[in-house]
């Protein structure tokens, strides 16, 4: 239960208590139950239509929030995962492969979090090593060779900052991805489905279109990290989240992203299939627009999109 959900939790408890009493004591409490359920529906709508940035950060971090591998079966047909960077090893924190979207062959890449402690250790909590980014780039260049559109799912706190990752060239691998992605001659569409953290997110995020689920975040640093750097107090993370403009609607207003994808009431985890189908609909919409561009126009469109971010007109 998240902090802002406490009022809803209390109403649910009352409903459960009345249902239990009704069943145990064989008394008719249905009118009271119906009133509380109507109240719960109203309050749920009120809460989730007035979320603060910090509330959305909490939703984006929910362990039960759908991951890349949860969405893929609903969006792509006949997906086959491909492994390895051909230099060191495979990285389970970065998955990728080929499949079909609406009958067309495509390449799919995404960061992958775990579902439980064991899985998170295997997936390194969704924080990719250099080999993960090199695998992603290998699949992107393969997609370019065979003229396949590329779809990426961004869902990471950031690239793994460990000693071994740095020794194997973490910064170089991300920098190379940024450079190579900028000049790809096929459509590239990215969607932020959870946390989009720093260079770890950008390493697969240089795309013609950047989409975000409405309760996802996209930032250069976590709110806790920003608060610690700016005010020497990570407890001020809520204020940092407000200041940083890391939510989907803020970033749309700033021109950083191209479209916000609505989530089911309560978050994507409430209806995984419906959320996946919403993502698929947006993928098809933007792909159809990008198909009108030549290979050179696609590369120029992507380059200019990111080149103008942060520009100031006096």
From Swiss-Prot:
A single cellular component GO annotation: acetyl-CoA carboxylase complex
Cited PROSITE patterns: COA_CT_CTER
Record has Oxidoreductase as a keyword: no
UniProt-listed Enzyme Commission number(s): 2.1.3.15
Compartments (UniProt record): Cytoplasm
Catalysis: reaction(s): N(6)-carboxybiotinyl-L-lysyl-[protein] + acetyl-CoA = N(6)-biotinyl-L-lysyl-[protein] + malonyl-CoA
UniProt-listed GO biological process terms: fatty acid biosynthetic process; malonyl-CoA biosynthetic process
InterPro entries found in the cross-reference section: Acetyl_CoA_COase_a_su, ClpP/crotonase-like_dom_sf, COA_CT_C
Domain CoA carboxyltransferase C-terminal, first and last residues per copy: 32-289
Molecular function in Gene Ontology: acetyl-CoA carboxylase activity; ATP binding; carboxyl- or carbamoyltransferase activity
Highest taxon of the lineage: Bacteria
Keywords, in A-Z order: ATP-binding, Cytoplasm, Fatty acid biosynthesis, Fatty acid metabolism, Lipid biosynthesis, Lipid metabolism, Nucleotide-binding, Transferase
Pathway: Lipid metabolism; malonyl-CoA biosynthesis; malonyl-CoA from acetyl-CoA: step 1/1
Family according to the record: Belongs to the AccA family.
Protein function: Component of the acetyl coenzyme A carboxylase (ACC) complex. First, biotin carboxylase catalyzes the carboxylation of biotin on its carrier protein (BCCP) and then the CO(2) group is transferred by the carboxyltransferase to acetyl-CoA to form malonyl-CoA.
SUBUNIT field: Acetyl-CoA carboxylase is a heterohexamer composed of biotin carboxyl carrier protein (AccB), biotin carboxylase (AccC) and two subunits each of ACCase subunit alpha (AccA) and ACCase subunit beta (AccD).
The protein's name in its UniProt record: Acetyl-coenzyme A carboxylase carboxyl transferase subunit alpha
Biological source species: Staphylococcus epidermidis (strain ATCC 35984 / DSM 28319 / BCRC 17069 / CCUG 31568 / BM 3577 / RP62A)
Gene this chain is encoded by: accA
